[in-house]
């Protein structure tokens, strides 16, 4: 299990993560929709996740969402690296009604994000552009490559939830055990 605490003038965050868990979660960020997405991420990846964030949500949700992405990415990095005996590459499409988002992952130590979801609009009081900020922070701190590609959908909630669930399933698959040593022709990740 990895535990990380991070405190800035904008947020105070505690994350506990067990990558080989059962999908249990205890999430409290003060941002209801974001909590719901993190619960989906834990459930469908199979990791146990606790997140507590006391952020300056009176300003807006940006610092909370971005900083949780940073800390969660660091926790995932600590749980997974050095990389060996995993599948490494995976993808998934977890549909939600009319919405479908494809996520392709490489747990290869090279941070890169291709993000192709709608950025405009609100889900209640949650700004759609924050989804990209979360994944950018997570991907770069986890040191993975991720392509998050919008395929179809009209309901913003469904599109974002499809993205989180697809990321979770792809992550579970990429981290699945494979007797391969270091999954790289370079011999190091």
From Swiss-Prot:
Its main location: cytoplasm. GO terms for cellular component: cytoplasm. Belongs to the imidazoleglycerol-phosphate dehydratase family. It catalyses: D-erythro-1-(imidazol-4-yl)glycerol 3-phosphate = 3-(imidazol-4-yl)-2-oxopropyl phosphate + H2O. This is Imidazoleglycerol-phosphate dehydratase. Its EC number is 4.2.1.19. Pathway: Amino-acid biosynthesis; L-histidine biosynthesis; L-histidine from 5-phospho-alpha-D-ribose 1-diphosphate: step 6/9. It is found in: Cytoplasm. InterPro entries: IGPD_sf (IPR038494), ImidazoleglycerolP_deHydtase (IPR000807), ImidazoleglycerP_deHydtase_CS (IPR020565), Ribosomal_Su5_D2-typ_SF (IPR020568). It holds the Pfam family IGPD. GO terms for biological process: L-histidine biosynthetic process. Keywords: Amino-acid biosynthesis, Cytoplasm, Histidine biosynthesis, Lyase. GO terms for molecular function: imidazoleglycerol-phosphate dehydratase activity. It comes from the Bacteria. It comes from Nautilia profundicola (strain ATCC BAA-1463 / DSM 18972 / AmH). HAMAP family: HisB. The gene is hisB.
